A protein has these predicted regions:
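Helix-coil boundary/capping segments in enzymes
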Residues: 1-228
């Protein structure tokens, strides 16, 4: 607990990776692998993050996460999907299967540590009807507190086809968190210039956020869904 008992320090941007979701997106993984030299990496689709062993980090080690939260004076975290596993561009059924497993695992950890964690739900955004059903299941039955999607999927953020989903999220009365897509990586703008100097994070994400906000405002989403 923070020193001021009247307030809490809340971390709203805290990604997590679950063992229960490994290989739940079919051939797209995700999975933790090792190459012939024993170097551990994280694979999703044809992309490899190397070296990366999530099992030895706060992404997967809950005890380590809780220790770090205590060390930094963080009282509560909103846990959210790893943006590498948004899977907004894979076949819909694979995304549906993955998101269901992701949200079930999220609900379980929140239930076990309800004083420390809230959970955000992943959606198979490429299938609007399935996304509405999963959002309702995640909030009404699993007790998750927010909806979490990327900024780059098969249609524009202001496409009217998304209006039923936006209406459903507004009706559920939970926040919609839109995380910038992995610019320069799978499902994001492919600009090789971003690869230099780690500009994917420095400039690419800011670019994605700017485009997303422009589409939400100038595309009329906020006007059509004032309670979103």
């Amino acid at each position: 607990m923070s020193s001021d008992e009247s307030s809490k320090v809340i971390d709203l941007h805290a990604h997590i990776v679950f063992q229960e979701t490994m290989n739940r997106a079919g051939s797209f993984g995700p999975e933790v692998c090792a190459d012939n030299d024993g170097i551990v990496f994280f694979r999703f689709g044809g992309y490899q993050m190397k070296p990366m062993d999530y099992s030895k980090t706060i992404f997967m080690d809950v005890a380590m996460r809780l220790e770090e939260m205590h060390r930094h004076g963080i009282d509560l975290q909103l846990l959210s999907p790893n943006p590498l596993t948004f899977f907004h561009h894979i076949p819909a059924q694979d995304a549906i299967n993955f998101c269901a497993a992701q949200n079930d695992a999220m609900a379980n950890i929140v239930l076990k540590h309800s004083d420390k964690f809230l959970g955000a739900a992943a959606l198979p955004i490429q299938d609007i009807d399935a996304s509405i059903k999963e959002a309702e299941r995640a909030v009404k039955h699993l007790g998750l507190s927010a909806i979490y999607i990327g900024t780059n999927f098969p249609f524009d953020i202001d496409d009217p086809c998304l209006d039923p989903l936006y209406s459903a999220i507004a009706e559920l009365n939970v926040p919609l968190f839109m995380h910038p897509a992995s610019s320069g990586g799978p499902g994001g703008p492919d600009d090789s210039r971003l690869a230099r100097f780690d500009m994917t994070l420095i400039l690419g994400y800011a670019y994605e956020e700017t485009v997303a906000v422009a589409q939400l405002v100038l595309g009329g989403v906020i006007d059509r869904h004032p309670n979103l």
